[in-house]
């Protein structure tokens, strides 16, 4: 009799994905972030479900319902802060996962990469709508500013914004629909993640060398299951340190003030994980130009495979490209820092330079450097 693990219609899918999956023998800890993202997603769905049981999506009671969760619900405070800081951990894992893909040339799997980009956009949309729900000052004004960007679209812009708002300003209708979308999107993300994995398992994982590893495969379990469990333990340790010792470290104090349409906060800024894109948006004095740059700052990932000019897939043996990659990382840190600063000299100039550098590295310097490295190989 065959093992039920290999014969049962449902269990064999799990078996072929997480147990008997042939995996390259040399994938490093940078390959842990896929499983960590899965854990983050499950954690967010579970904590979000329990929060939704006590939250009310109404402008008059939303803020006090969040306070009620923290004060009166059993362990409500830990659920709320795990959800809020879980989003930060989610984005840390996302950025590292995308960075790994760029460094080791994982974008050469086009289907997996493109679904990954769709996932990134969906997660960003979900996080943005979730930030609006507590209905604090930064929730309200963040929603107003970001949705208002759509008015830059010629001809239909204003109508589009009012359609999204469900009125002439961010109000009860906006909050209700944002709650509905914030609830449904994680399940769409879950479905997309399954498709992401499906395409990945068609080709098999990439590895640090960027060369085929068919001749040297090992079973996923126990080798990588134990490695993933270690990653999960470290992730949970970091999350719980954040939640239990400084839960508001990454939040904005303005969000502890109930939303007031008559009083604008001095500095409107999104959560830290959107700051790099926010800086690129602010760096262009023209509204439509800023919006296009904002979208393109993420969408640029979609054309990365077309810009791959190197004869080698991975950057492991390409020191010049490595220098550019780490310059890009430093540039993203700079953009993130500038996004949290007021719009004044010298921050405007630094932000503009960092924005130009971001696009220059990805569109011009990296492909050009790869060609130089190809020629150096001939020596």
From Swiss-Prot:
One of its GO terms (cellular component) is respiratory chain complex III. It is found in: Mitochondrion inner membrane. Heme b b566 binds at residues 97, 196. InterPro entries: Cyt_b/b6_C, Cyt_b/b6_C_sf, Cyt_b/b6_N, Cytb/b6-like_sf, Cytochrome_b, Cytochrome_b_C_euk/bac, Cytochrome_b_N_euk/bac, Di-haem_cyt_TM. One of its GO terms (biological process) is mitochondrial electron transport, ubiquinol to cytochrome c. The chain crosses the membrane at residues 33-53, 77-98, 113-133, 178-198, 226-246, 288-308, 320-340, 347-367. It is a multi-pass membrane protein. It holds the Pfam family Cytochrom_B_C. Binds 2 heme b groups non-covalently. The cytochrome bc1 complex contains 11 subunits: 3 respiratory subunits (MT-CYB, CYC1 and UQCRFS1), 2 core proteins (UQCRC1 and UQCRC2) and 6 low-molecular weight proteins (UQCRH/QCR6, UQCRB/QCR7, UQCRQ/QCR8, UQCR10/QCR9, UQCR11/QCR10 and a cleavage product of UQCRFS1). This cytochrome bc1 complex then forms a dimer. Belongs to the cytochrome b family. This is Cytochrome b. It comes from Meles meles (Eurasian badger). The gene is MT-CYB.
